[in-house]
Structure formats: structure tokens, C-alpha cells
Amino acid sequence: MDKPHTQIMSIWLIVSTLLLLLMIVVGGITRLTNAGLSIVEWNPVSGIIPPISSEDWNNEFNKYTASPEFKLINNQITISEFKYIFFIEYIHRLLGRITGIIIIIPFLIFCYLKSLTKLQYYRLLLITCLVVIQGFMGWYMVKSGLKETPYINHCRLAGHLLLAVIIYHQLIAELLIIIQPFKCYTLATSKANNSNSTSINVINLKIKLIIFNKIIIFLLYTQIMFGALVAGLDAGLIYNEFPNMGDSLIPIEILNQSIDFTMFDNQVLMQFIHRWFGILISGLIICYAIWLIILNKHALRGMGMVAACLVLVQVTTGIITLLYHVPILAALTHQVGAILILTTFLFIQNIVTNFELLH
């Protein structure tokens, strides 16, 4: 790919990544304000135009009054209050459409111009397919709350968030491949140290760093999933204390019952797992960050410091979110913090993967 195409693709991927990050934030706001069920239809094309006239608003409000959420929860809501939650969900859906267009249309143009390598084509095709699936996944999630029970299925919510994170991950990975910010980064300190034994040690170190980093990325995905389950179950609104859950570190509900296949529906268990799994991952990240700092290689040292700082902030925002009964700002900061930590480790993965050994 020539330089102009590389620059254009880099800008496209950066814009797509930022839009997706914004989508995740707005999705969090939608969940925290309970606005997700305010639009009871899915019209990918006609739904782009919002209600404008009083008649339009009355039509939308009448549709909402027929929904289980209105009948069982929000039957006192006014049309002014309805407009507020409607616009939050509308913005989320509109942003989803814009993000989809921004990702899909340029991809088709690049294909038409035949400016993609074979590997790029397949990687970007995967991203495009995931974006389309995400649109259907969003409606599949919302649809779960339009039945008798007016609550969005928490497992579908977790799937929707995880799919967004996977797309974000793939966009970041593709961007790093194109711009190659750490290409030819040298792990070895100098040519004088390039004996065979030193080269072997460096290779072993590189393998260890890659493996450990991938483990942390996997654990982060798992923790994000548990966070989504906690959000979907409103499990952050119980046991608003730390470190204890009631009279002990382990809540009595867990001590008095066996774990079965309904564990993902259990508010207490999900909060317990999310808080202590988070502490475990935070400890691993701090240890890994210290390791990177001790290696004293400029890019790794900097990333290690960033990772350590982010995880300390993340633990703090998590505790604040819990203690203060899930305030929107703290909860959003906590959600974005998880994405930023994941991003940091995607950058670290790129660094350690692109080490060039001196011979």
C-alpha cells in the first residue's frame, strides 16, 4: 500500500475507533439512565429521523405506553420525561448507524480500488461483518425487554458490550499494524551484548512477555463481561460497602447456597466475582507493570507506568461506584477505564511482538 493510502486508512481507523469508544460511552449512559427500552421498534432506515412535531411525539409516546416497561414501571412518566430517555436511546442508535457507515463504506471503497493486501482484506472484512452483527445484536438485546418482563436480558447486554469491545480491539490492532509505531524497537541494549546466550535470553523474555500479556488481555475481557452482568442485574445497588459484603468478605448468600447453572442470574454472586476478580487482575497488572518498569526499556517502561496508574484509578472508581450506589459519572469513568486499560495492553502487545533482535 502506498503512503497516501496508508495515511487515509490510518485516519479512517482512528476515526472509527474513536466513534466506537464514544458508542461504548453512550451505551453506558443509556443503560445507567434506563433509556434502552424507550424506542420499542427497530427501523434501521426510517428510524434515522427523530420525532419533530407534537403528533410525532404523541405517536412515539403511545407506542411506549403499550410496552411492559410503561405498564409495570414507568406508568407515571410524562411526555417531557419520555422525550429525555427517548433522545438518549435515539442518540445511541444514531451513533451506531453513523459508526457502521463510517466503517463499512470506506472498506467497500478500498476494496473497489484494490488497495488492500489479502490479509488486510480478510481482517477488515471480519470487522465489517462484526459491525453488521452488532446492529442485530443491539435489537436482539432490546427485544428481550419488550416482553412480559420489562428488563433487558443481562446476558444479551454482556454479549452486546463484549462484541463492541472485540470490534474496538480489532480496529486498534489493525491501526497498529498500519502505523507501526514500535517497528524495529530493539530489546537488546547494545551490539556488545549480542552473544548467542544473550539472544536466547532475549527471545525467551519476549515469549514470556507475549504470553503474560495475552493472559492479562483475556482476563480483562472476562472482567468486562462480569462488569456487564453486574450492570444488567443492577448488582451494583446491593452491598454498597467495601471490602466486606455484609458482615464478612464472603456474603452469607454465597455461604448458604450451592453454585449451579443459574449463577449468572445471581446478583450477589456476580458482584462478589466482579469485585474480587477485579482485585486479582489489578494485582497481576501491578506486578506485570513493575516487571516492565524494571526492564528499563523506554517504551515498555512508559507503558508499565501507564498501566499501573490506570489500574489504580480503575480500582478507585470501582469502589466509589459501589459506595455511592452507582452514580453515573463514576460508573462511566469505571467503564471507560476498563477500555483504556485494555488499550494499553494492546499497545504493549504490539511493542513486545515487534521487538527486533540485534545480531
Curated annotation (Swiss-Prot):
Q: Where does heme bind?
A: 274, 334
* InterPro entries in the cross-refs: COX15/CtaA_fam, HemeA_Synthase_type2
Q: A GO molecular function for this record? A: oxidoreductase activity, acting on NAD(P)H, heme protein as acceptor
Of the GO CC terms on this record, one is:
plasma membrane
EC code(s) of this entry? 1.17.99.9
How does it sit in the bilayer? Answer: Multi-pass membrane protein
* Top enzyme category: oxidoreductase
Which cofactor does this sequence's record say it needs? heme b
Q: Where does the UniProt annotation locate this protein?
A: Cell membrane
Q: Where are the transmembrane segments?
A: 8-28, 94-114, 124-144, 159-179, 215-235, 276-296, 303-323, 328-348
- Keywords, sorted A to Z: Cell membrane, Heme biosynthesis, Iron, Membrane, Metal-binding, Oxidoreductase, Transmembrane, Transmembrane helix
Pathway(s) served: Porphyrin-containing compound metabolism; heme A biosynthesis; heme A from heme O: step 1/1
Reaction catalysed by this enzyme? Fe(II)-heme o + 2 A + H2O = Fe(II)-heme a + 2 AH2
Q: What is its main location?
A: membrane
What GO biological process terms are annotated to this protein in UniProt? heme A biosynthetic process
As for what it does, the entry says: Catalyzes the conversion of heme O to heme A by two successive hydroxylations of the methyl group at C8. The first hydroxylation forms heme I, the second hydroxylation results in an unstable dihydroxymethyl group, which spontaneously dehydrates, resulting in the formyl group of heme A.
Give the UniProt family note: Belongs to the COX15/CtaA family. Type 2 subfamily.
What is annotated about its quaternary structure and interactions? Interacts with CtaB.
Q: Which HAMAP family has this protein been placed in?
A: HemeA_synth_type2
Q: What is this protein called?
A: Heme A synthase
Give the organism the record lists.
Orientia tsutsugamushi (strain Boryong)
Q: What is the phylogenetic placement of the source species in the record?
A: Bacteria, Pseudomonadati, Pseudomonadota, Alphaproteobacteria, Rickettsiales
The UniProt gene name for this protein comes to ctaA
